[in-house]
């Protein structure tokens, strides 16, 4: 096989490289082009579609194109945040794959000059009855916990689903959030002819070589041969690197800073050069090596972790090096900025590579791949009337997709740094205090591939609205979103069709909800053999609560005697709900349409209701439907529920539909009249469901008939134990 094909390049791509250079590249140059032209680094199949997403908003300080997006939260402060995938490595080596995914996203945040304050993770696995899936799940969770806990950054939120489509290809999407003084915001740019280029942090080894290429192809049935492509992480080294970088930034005289992630020194140098429109000359014999005999090819493509590339003002390099030495870290001048337009690489006095930075970045191919919009056909109907509502509630509460994820977050230190206001499991989103202010931020990841698979456009709209509602029910105003788009092979028209429709759905949702996209990540080739994952857009979002004392809305029911209301109009569709899957299997029932306008009104209304003192709690209706959401609010508040309502829907439809855009709120009886007036003035549909009681029970009567009467303590035991039981 031709060398370029082994590296992941097509014949046409190789021809383009030769034509651009006017010569054949040598091995080092070919390797550099191959990693930078990989799907993982170049976004060559997705770029033309990603440009359709709205990226501007009043709070946006930094949009796509940098290490992370940044939004303004006032007081001269910004929030830097980004989500990225580490799917392929985690399928081969779950602990290290997940751990290094966390490490990489943390470096993206502090490269902006921000101090990381929180981690989130969005995970997808096959069904837990498979020993391999249990191995992957426990390994990934341990890897995230091991890295995050050691570095001292709390893992505060996330989401986990278990569905057949992720059997061979798990998804590990990690998000990091950091806080930055906007006046000290730093970018990954290389400028200033003669300025030195420093490589700081860990030594360079052979781990992760061609990791970016590995992430740009389908997994084989036996991925063991790819184990060397998985990087190895050292969280203690990363902690030192984090503190040293922030201290160096505080000292000043740093022009730009970039993480060495996918494609290692090749990508960090070429991306910094492209942003600064400058050349860079590198001397590889100065690079501190972990292993003897490493070639220039290996040094340029190594993805060894815990390394950063810095451009420093000439004359200040010795002071910067002293800072890193104080933290017991390597810091070496490995090059300088030139007035050319090339990345020049020297080794033992010989030029081993000389490539225009444009060839590695903006000249990478961009494909408008053929696509076929998925047909939504052979739709079926079901009659759920025969399903006992009490039995359904019990089964759903202990389903691994709904049951409390105590097994996961009890391994994470979610309190380290003492910024966490609400613990995992007690809110729809994590809430973090911004020290020195009254403010808080709410952060969340969300997405549901099964809905997207059955209707990519509506499913994508659902993912955006669901995440925004998760913030709004805490009292937060959404400021911006990042996304991780996980799909199969883009060379297949049906997969590309899913992607195009998802982008269209996200675009519509972001525009109507006024939430700009600040960046993200695309992960293609999540496919083994002919089996692709569900198309899975994962949305990460950040929102602002102006005053935690007066603006924070709890999820838990607060007071016996409070009235329970539903915001939004229930329509009863069961398409792709957990109820449908549990009792009817894979039935092609239509996905409920998403009412973005109603969702927007509710998102804007909730913080106002709290500020007016008109609601005591709020919780959005999500997985499992209204019945499960009522239980979750009751469990959190240790209070019972009485529902007495008349509806034209079947009880099963009313209680277990997962229509997005419904929110349960509790209201003091003396505030009821004012509450209803405010809600109706906002144009939001509202229904009175019942009231909070002090008993150990949930009682639901519909149309004069009791359909559920259960002890809350027994239901809570199912909810608390479901995931642990599934792992046994």
From Swiss-Prot:
Entry keyword annotation includes Metal-binding: yes
UniProt: Mg(2+) 2 binding residues: 108, 259
Q: Which residues form the active site?
A: 40, 86 (proton acceptor)
Q: Which domain of life is it from?
A: Bacteria
What S-S linkages are listed for this chain?
A: none
Question: Subcellular localization, per the record?
Answer: Cytoplasm
Entry EC no(s): 6.3.5.3
Q: InterPro entries this protein is in?
A: PRibForGlyAmidine_synth_PurL (IPR010074), PurL_linker (IPR041609), PurM-like_C_dom (IPR010918), PurM-like_C_sf (IPR036676), PurM-like_N (IPR016188), PurM-like_N_sf (IPR036921)
- Which positions bind Mg(2+) 1? 84, 521
Question: How would you classify this enzyme at the top EC level?
Answer: ligase
Instruction: Provide the GO biological process annotations.
Output: 'de novo' IMP biosynthetic process
Which SUPFAM superfamilies does this chain map to? Answer: PurM C-terminal domain-like, PurM N-terminal domain-like
Q: What GO cellular-component annotations does this UniProt entry give? A: cytoplasm
| Pathway where this protein functions | Purine metabolism; IMP biosynthesis via de novo pathway; 5-amino-1-(5-phospho-D-ribosyl)imidazole from N(2)-formyl-N(1)-(5-phospho-D-ribosyl)glycinamide: step 1/2
Which positions does UniProt annotate for substrate binding? 85-88, 107, 231, 303-305, 523
Which GO molecular function terms does the record list? ATP binding; magnesium ion binding; phosphoribosylformylglycinamidine synthase activity
Keyword terms of this UniProt record = ATP-binding, Cytoplasm, Ligase, Magnesium, Metal-binding, Nucleotide-binding, Purine biosynthesis
- Subcellular location, principal: cytoplasm
Q: Which residues bind ATP?
A: 43, 82, 483, 520
What does it do? Answer: Part of the phosphoribosylformylglycinamidine synthase complex involved in the purines biosynthetic pathway. Catalyzes the ATP-dependent conversion of formylglycinamide ribonucleotide (FGAR) and glutamine to yield formylglycinamidine ribonucleotide (FGAM) and glutamate. The FGAM synthase complex is composed of three subunits. PurQ produces an ammonia molecule by converting glutamine to glutamate. PurL transfers the ammonia molecule to FGAR to form FGAM in an ATP-dependent manner.
How this chain assembles, per its entry, is: Monomer. Part of the FGAM synthase complex composed of 1 PurL, 1 PurQ and 2 PurS subunits.
Which family does the UniProt entry place this protein in? Belongs to the FGAMS family.
Q: What is this protein called?
A: Phosphoribosylformylglycinamidine synthase subunit PurL
Q: Which organism is it from?
A: Carboxydothermus hydrogenoformans (strain ATCC BAA-161 / DSM 6008 / Z-2901)
Name the encoding gene, please: purL
